[in-house]
């Protein structure tokens, strides 16, 4: 039988983590992240819906790429997704969020560094047909007690809504681990950066 590293599937001891007392803990990667009590943690079904909506947007612009992203789900997982407000309570403003996603790199021998992974992600985004802009290159940054590499981007969604995102990436245990923050204003960006700065690795 081939190992999970060969297939790119999730290992048997993989831990999706859980939220207890407003703290997300993950034993597989050995970290925890406090979550502000008034923010809204998405459950598994909600995270699946968010992922499907993202795929749909990409497929509308590039059907072949949408299929590739769907096929990659077997080696990818969304560990955490948290929004500032409940979806149905937001009117006239962007609902900021942060999340943690991982991808098993078992089949990607070319990815040796976080920069390699972010470059691949950037290439896929540029093929998506969505109007992405990348104002800066990849920058090293310390989040909590770990050194990450960050990629910043903006995108125009649903006609005229400009959304900013920052992807903070490390490679750990054969996975790319990405913390992603999404924001509509500078104030939201700073609030999100403050939240994720509280992550602690064992």
Protein language model features and the residues they cover:
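Mid-length scaffold segments of soluble, non-membrane domains
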Residues: 99-116, 120-135
């Amino acid at each position: 039988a081939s190992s999970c590293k060969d297939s790119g599937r999730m290992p048997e001891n993989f831990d999706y983590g859980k939220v207890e007392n407003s703290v997300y803990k993950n034993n597989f990667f050995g970290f925890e992240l406090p979550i502000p009590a008034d923010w809204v943690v998405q459950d598994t079904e909600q995270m699946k819906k968010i992922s499907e909506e993202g795929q749909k947007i990409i497929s509308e612009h590039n059907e072949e790429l949408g299929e590739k992203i769907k096929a990659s789900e077997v080696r990818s997982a969304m560990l955490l997704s948290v929004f500032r407000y409940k979806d149905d309570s937001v009117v006239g403003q962007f609902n900021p969020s942060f999340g943690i996603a991982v991808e098993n790199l078992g089949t990607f021998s070319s990815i040796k560094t976080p920069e390699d992974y972010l470059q691949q992600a950037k290439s896929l985004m540029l093929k998506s047909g969505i109007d992405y802009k990348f104002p800066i290159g990849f920058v090293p940054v310390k989040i909590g007690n770990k050194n990450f590499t960050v990629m910043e981007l903006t995108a125009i969604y649903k006609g005229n809504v400009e959304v900013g995102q920052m992807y903070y990436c490390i490679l750990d245990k054969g996975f790319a681990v990405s913390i992603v923050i999404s924001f509509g204003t500078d104030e939201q960006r700073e609030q999100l950066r403050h939240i994720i700065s509280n992550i602690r690795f064992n």
